[in-house]
Amino acid sequence: MAKVSIKLTKSVIGTKPNQRKTVEALGLKKIGQVTEKEMTPQLRGMIDVVQHLVEVKEI
């Protein structure tokens, strides 16, 4: 599996509760915070839910 870098680029204020929980489950709390994860089908689905809030780069 490929590794990806996920960066929170926009605030979760005003978003739906399921989107907030998804951002938290990705390990992101503050704008600009970056986390690295292994790309899996589950992670791909989580990224799709919050694609307007995060920036994803393949490592």
UniProtKB/Swiss-Prot annotation:
One of its GO terms (cellular component) is cytosolic large ribosomal subunit. InterPro entries: Ribo_uL30_ferredoxin-like_sf (IPR036919), Ribosomal_uL30_bac-type (IPR005996), Ribosomal_uL30_CS (IPR018038), Ribosomal_uL30_ferredoxin-like (IPR016082). The keyword Ribonucleoprotein applies. One of its GO terms (molecular function) is structural constituent of ribosome. Keywords: Ribonucleoprotein, Ribosomal protein. Disulfide bonds: none annotated. SUPFAM superfamilies: Ribosomal protein L30p/L7e. GO terms for biological process: translation. Part of the 50S ribosomal subunit. Belongs to the universal ribosomal protein uL30 family. This is Large ribosomal subunit protein uL30. The lineage of its organism: Bacteria, Bacillati, Bacillota, Clostridia, Peptostreptococcales.
